[in-house]
UniProtKB/Swiss-Prot annotation:
The keyword tRNA-binding applies. Monomer. CDD domains: PTH (cd00462). This is Peptidyl-tRNA hydrolase. Transmembrane segments: none annotated. Keywords: Cytoplasm, Hydrolase, RNA-binding, tRNA-binding. It catalyses: an N-acyl-L-alpha-aminoacyl-tRNA + H2O = an N-acyl-L-amino acid + a tRNA + H(+). The keyword Plastid does not apply. It is an enzyme of class 3 (hydrolase). It comes from Borrelia recurrentis (strain A1).
């Protein structure tokens, strides 16, 4: 099974290391770990490579989070992918920092990036990898997800990226349930 991994985030250096950009962070880790470089297309960056005769495409949308769905007509066409190849990596404020959840399908909840994707695709039947970023009720939701991780939190997030960069490329139609168990039981 070919895999299209789309990490959500906001473009620009001012969003680096923010909670909302963990999807970008994991894509960056995968690019670095596999000695790749991102190439620029019209409204996204991508890297394309093979693992065990499977095509893996990594994507960072260059639209802002709320418009993430706009890239999919171009991406599916360019890379000959379909919705069943899609895995979206996204932040989740309902999960504690350092916890992850892999799902085959799901809803958008309060996440505007997922809502945009689901609207663009006309479906919610695509894979999601949620990365817990914690929650702080002292902040409003928008301010919290746009806040940067502190140093100790960033160490934990990097540990999550290290773990996921080992696990995520092995996801296929035969191993998905096993990967759900492995990833969902992890905590950093």
């Amino acid at each position: 099974m070919n895999l299209l991994i789309v990490g959500l985030g906001n473009p620009g250096s001012n969003f680096l290391h923010t909670r909302h950009n963990v999807g970008f962070g994991l894509i960056d880790k995968l690019v670095m770990k596999n000695a790749l470089s991102l190439r620029k297309a019209k409204n996204y960056e991508y890297a394309d490579f093979n693992v065990d005769s499977r095509r893996i495409v990594l994507i960072k949308p260059l639209t802002y989070m709320n418009l993430s769905g706009n890239i999919f007509p171009c991406v599916f066409s360019k890379f000959y992918m379909k919705i069943n190849n899609l895995l979206v990596v996204v932040d989740n404020v309902d999960l504690p920092l350092g916890k992850c959840r892999l799902r085959k399908v799901g809803g958008a909840s309060t996440h505007n990036g997922l809502r945009s994707i689901s609207e663009s695709l006309g479906s919610t039947k695509y894979g999601r990898l949620y990365i817990g970023v914690g929650n702080n009720s002292a902040f409003g939701l928008k301010d919290f997800v746009l806040s940067k991780f502190n140093d100790s939190e960033l160490v934990r997030v990097k540990n999550v990226f290290n773990f996921l960069s080992e696990e995520i490329l092995g996801i296929d139609e035969f191993s998905f349930e096993h990967k759900i168990a492995t990833i969902n039981s992890s905590s950093f």
